[in-house]
Every structure is written in C-alpha cells, then in structure tokens.
Amino acid sequence: MASIVARSRLDRLRAICLTLPEATEERTWESPNWRVNHRIFAMCHEDATSVTMKADPDERVALLGSDADRYFVPAYVGSKGWVGVVLNSSTDWDEIRELVTTSYCLIAPKRLARAVQSA
C-alpha cells in the first residue's frame, strides 16, 4: 500500500494528467499510467518516487544534462525519447505540468495537441 506522501504525489500527478482532453488513467505493470487515444503519455510507480514521460528531444538533452539527481533516462523507454523526473518534497509541480503537457502533445492526435497548445 502506498504511503500518505506517495498518495499525495500520485493525486497531484493524476490531477495534472486528467485535466488534458480525452486523457484516461489505466493500470499496467501494477502501476498507474495516463493515456490519450490508447497511447501512454505519462507513467509512474505506485510509490510515486518518479514520473516518466515523452520529452521534446532538445529539452530532454537539456534536462538530462542539468541535474543527474533529478532527471534520468528511464528503463525500457529511455531509448525512445522518454525522460524520468524524480518526485520529492522539492518537486516543482508547475514544471511537472509543463513536461506532462509536452509529452501529451507529442503523443496525442494532432487535433487534441493543437487544442492544448492554443489554450
């Protein structure tokens, strides 16, 4: 069972992801993930110590080069342009919102991505 802190982080992440158009939450590999059009745009483990998402290629390089304690290449999907971000007491949730939104726009159908980008 997740701790109170993990549930709080997971709730914040869930709120960010599910505000995006047509986003859904599913459980795969015993962990929550968020999808649009059946494609994953963000995922995390139940302990909510990190979130993994697709990143803009240039932004991914910048993130990975900026703080190795905070950003990392995730297993399995790192080679496909995804980045992991550690979630802890100093997490910048506005940044997480921006990164999740970017991931969503990279994964979502163009009409949904355009709607989010123009909002």
Give a label for each model feature:
Residues 1-119:
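Charge-dense, helix-prone N-terminal extensions
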